Amino acid sequence: METNFIDLRNLTELTVREFMSNHNVAGHDVDHFIAVRNHAIKALKYENISNSKKLQVEFAAMLHDVDDPKIFSQSIDYQNAKYILDTIFTKMSFENIISDCTYDVFKQGIVTLISLVSCSKNGDDGVEESWMAIPRDADRLEAIGKIGIQRCTDYANHIKLPYYLDSTPRAKTSEEALSFANRDRFDRYKNGHKSVSMIDHYYDKLLHIGRPEYLCSNNPYILEKSNKRNQEMIDYVINFKFE
């Protein structure tokens, strides 16, 4: 079984790389997909769930952005994720890996997990079972901390978003930073409000998504990583050099 999992993982990575070869966007490339998947794999070591559910989590983590409208504006109903899964399982026998559900049920379960990832759509929505939030929380780990700071900067440069405006909060302490990142701002973001600057994006979204109350997986690996990465972002906005 372990050999099959490794072969499947390698085939998945190859298939995704081929699919995304002409579609990489700053912060949303295959390296990001793999980083999110690797967080999910580490988190799954703490979960007592079936192999089929573990595979669904891993696939959802790897495929969570392949239908992102920032990359594929015409994608409908997770068509790219479904296509990649179908491609993979024409090359490898599903029945040799999973025996407790049909392929259609397995695939739909992955789509459901992917649908939970988007912050603007499903920000802090609850899940039926905590493990179902692992792909979302694993993705959030890559949006916060030092890697998240770099990704945010790269994406701001990519879409030509200003670093700050006159109206952007200027926190001097951790307490001020957290007070500016209030629930109203996060609710507006989840309801479609777009951040007006890069630093505003920290207060609208990034300083929220790594807090324990928004990490529905309640997974020990994810909670430990998020705690450190949250502080790195707070330090960043406090020490940001406004001209």
UniProtKB/Swiss-Prot annotation:
This is Uncharacterized protein L803. It comes from Acanthamoeba polyphaga mimivirus (APMV).
